[in-house]
């Protein structure tokens, strides 16, 4: 519907593209974000993110494109359970599932293809919901371009996860070797805020330019971003603009004391030392990337999730084995994803089996999973008891609390207990401002509430970025 833009003191531009109600109902999001070194680039980025989210979520929700089956029943499928398990090898909850059980569980599968174009099937809903660090959704000018962008994204996440988990001390890029005027302008903008910028080589020896930017916003906290590109310049600009973009996120700040290696200057290299994979076409770049991951002992799978109505090429990418960025703060583990998928395909027996066996670290996990299983069995009254108990526990996982408040609030709304419904709504907004859950609690017309909730989200976004909104095209606020 609209785009909202603002300019960071570093000179980078950021955009929030406001989706229509249809976008919201499919993705659960109000907006999509973009950033760039100019207005058009930021606007373009937000619209591409809008397109990729809409296309991918719509594809995964399409039952006509979902095949319910198991590893055992999908004979001669190129994608094996080893490809799935390789990306969660560090997850302790994996021991709760026996290999033969995983082979027999019914899952939702989507048609994909490997690096050679061979048809195969992947449980993409499970991958998209759980393995966030190893799947990439990207839009492009062509399907090959979308595949390149998606593959670069998963390689970025894999590199960052490897650096974080192993505590690797990578080379510092000498800022004197940076000649690009746009990059130098952004860095100077950061310095004008009193921030210090450390640019590091995150390529990990792969023939792919990968740059990490660690920016100290004060002596104790910093922001870290990693980006790749076809050239060192492209990777640097992407990492710098993303670093400015995530500044408004309160949870993106890291402690300097816990990651001192990002500020070490023991080993320096020139940005010219980074590899260059630029080629004449997206297909040539894609072939180079496929060769790179193959030489690293990795397998890559793609899925064309382009929406016919939109007509914008979108691809999902899965890389195995790949390191997954930890999701522990949101309670995501292998069991989390598997139980959710089993409930989606109505395999209550399989979900119940895992639920009984799992010895979760805290009681809130049991209460959450048990409540969701009862919801799937249409035993809402029993489920509500578990959700009420969960809210009484000292639960640190926001998603568990959000879901519990949602079901309790919906129940109160249906019973016309406006006071309790309002209490649950207020609690939801405090946990997650702009959450789509209140749309189901506020009134009988979600379409009307959608507009109100969307405006609330926009105000919160503007409030987060208020310190960086400058005089912009004659208006002393963010441009609509």
Each PLM stretch: what is its role?
Residues 1-480:
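Helix-biased "structured C-terminal domain" signature
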């Amino acid at each position: 519907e609209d785009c909202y833009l603002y300019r960071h003191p570093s000179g980078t531009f950021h955009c929030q593209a406001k989706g229509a109600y249809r976008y919201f109902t499919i993705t659960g999001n109000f907006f999509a974000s973009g950033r760039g070194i100019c207005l058009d680039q930021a606007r373009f980025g937000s619209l591409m993110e809008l397109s990729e989210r809409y296309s991918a979520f719509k594809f995964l929700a399409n039952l006509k494109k979902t095949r319910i089956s198991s590893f055992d029943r999908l004979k001669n499928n190129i994608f094996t359970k080893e490809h799935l398990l390789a990306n969660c090898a560090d997850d302790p909850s994996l021991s709760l599932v026996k290999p033969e059980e995983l082979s027999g569980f019914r899952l939702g599968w989507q048609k994909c293809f490997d690096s050679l174009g061979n048809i195969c099937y992947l449980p993409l809903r499970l991958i998209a919901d759980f393995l966030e660090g190893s799947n990439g959704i990207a839009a492009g000018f062509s399907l090959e371009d979308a595949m390149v962008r998606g593959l670069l994204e998963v390689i970025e996440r894999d590199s960052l996860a490897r650096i974080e988990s192993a505590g690797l001390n990578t080379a510092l890029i000498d800022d004197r070797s940076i000649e690009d005027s746009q990059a130098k302008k952004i860095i100077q903008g950061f310095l004008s805020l009193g921030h210090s910028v450390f640019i590091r080589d995150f390529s990990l020896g792969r023939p792919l330019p990968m740059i990490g930017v660690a920016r100290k916003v004060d002596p104790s906290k910093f922001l870290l971003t990693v980006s790749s590109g076809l050239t060192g310049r492209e990777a640097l600009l992407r990492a710098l603009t993303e670093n400015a973009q995530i500044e408004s996120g309160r949870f993106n700040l890291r402690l300097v004391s816990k990651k001192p290696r990002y500020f070490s200057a023991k080993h320096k290299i020139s940005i010219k030392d980074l590899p260059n994979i630029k080629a004449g076409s997206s297909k040539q770049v894609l072939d180079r990337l496929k060769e790179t991951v193959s030489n690293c002992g990795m397998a890559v799978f793609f899925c064309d999730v382009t929406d016919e109505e939109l007509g914008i090429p979108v691809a999902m990418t899965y890389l195995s084995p790949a390191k997954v960025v930890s999701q522990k703060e949101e309670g995501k583990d292998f069991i989390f994803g598997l139980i959710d998928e089993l409930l989606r395909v109505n395999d209550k027996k399989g979900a119940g089996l895992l639920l009984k066996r799992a010895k979760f670290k805290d009681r809130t996990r049991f209460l959450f999973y048990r409540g969701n299983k009862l919801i799937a069995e249409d035993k809402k009254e029993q489920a509500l008891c578990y959700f009420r108990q969960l809210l009484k526990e000292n639960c640190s996982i926001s998603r568990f609390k959000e879901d519990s408040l949602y079901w309790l609030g919906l129940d109160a709304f249906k019973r016309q207990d406006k006071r309790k419904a309002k209490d649950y709504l207020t609690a939801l907004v405090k946990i997650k401002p702009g959450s789509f859950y209140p749309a189901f609690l506020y009134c009988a017309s979600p379409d009307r509430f959608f507009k109100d909730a969307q405006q609330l989200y926009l105000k919160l976004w503007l409030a987060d970025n208020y310190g960086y909104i400058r005089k912009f095209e004659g208006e002393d606020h963010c441009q609509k």
